Each structure stands twice: as structure tokens, then as C-alpha cells.
Amino acid sequence: MAKSKNHTAHNQTRKAHRNGIKKPKTYKYPSLKGVDPKFRRNHKHALHGTAKALAAAKK
């Protein structure tokens, strides 16, 4: 006779939780890889303007 059971989830959650299910690490500056090129170009200039405004406010 052919085998009948091809899959079971038994013990899988226990194995996963033994080391803890971790969230992916988040970084302060996430990569802009894959972001719309038009947005990236404008973002560069927006950051520069923000830096100038912060510097002026600091004085």
C-alpha cells in the first residue's frame, strides 16, 4: 500500500518558539534600494533643505 500521510504540523510551533520567533531587525536609516528613482532624486534635495533649516535654527 502507498503511504498516506504526507504532512503534519506537529511539533513545528514548539521548535519555532524554543529560540523565540524574532522580528526582523530594523535600522535607523532603511535602505532606499528599490524606491522610485524620482522620489530618491527629490529626497536628496529635501534633506539638504532640512539640514540648512536646522542649522539656521541652531544659530
Swiss-Prot record:
Crosslink position(s): Glycyl lysine isopeptide (Lys-Gly) (interchain with G-Cter in ubiquitin): K52
Subcellular location: Cytoplasm
GO molecular function per UniProt: structural constituent of ribosome
Domain of life from the UniProt record: Eukaryota
Residue span of region Disordered: 1-37
Chief location bin: cytoplasm
Gene3D superfamilies the record matches: 6.10.140.1730
Biological process according to GO: cytoplasmic translation
Entry GO terms, CC: cytoplasm; cytosol; cytosolic large ribosomal subunit
Ranges of biased composition (kind: Basic residues): 1-26
UniProt keyword annotations, A-Z: Cytoplasm, Isopeptide bond, Ribonucleoprotein, Ribosomal protein, Ubl conjugation
Protein's job: Component of the ribosome, a large ribonucleoprotein complex responsible for the synthesis of proteins in the cell. The small ribosomal subunit (SSU) binds messenger RNAs (mRNAs) and translates the encoded message by selecting cognate aminoacyl-transfer RNA (tRNA) molecules. The large subunit (LSU) contains the ribosomal catalytic site termed the peptidyl transferase center (PTC), which catalyzes the formation of peptide bonds, thereby polymerizing the amino acids delivered by tRNAs into a polypeptide chain.
Quaternary structure note: Component of the large ribosomal subunit (LSU). Mature yeast ribosomes consist of a small (40S) and a large (60S) subunit. The 40S small subunit contains 1 molecule of ribosomal RNA (18S rRNA) and 33 different proteins (encoded by 57 genes). The large 60S subunit contains 3 rRNA molecules (25S, 5.8S and 5S rRNA) and 46 different proteins (encoded by 81 genes).
Family: Belongs to the eukaryotic ribosomal protein eL29 family.
Note: Present with 51100 molecules/cell in log phase SD medium.
Protein name: Large ribosomal subunit protein eL29
Organism: Saccharomyces cerevisiae (strain ATCC 204508 / S288c)
Name of the coding gene: RPL29
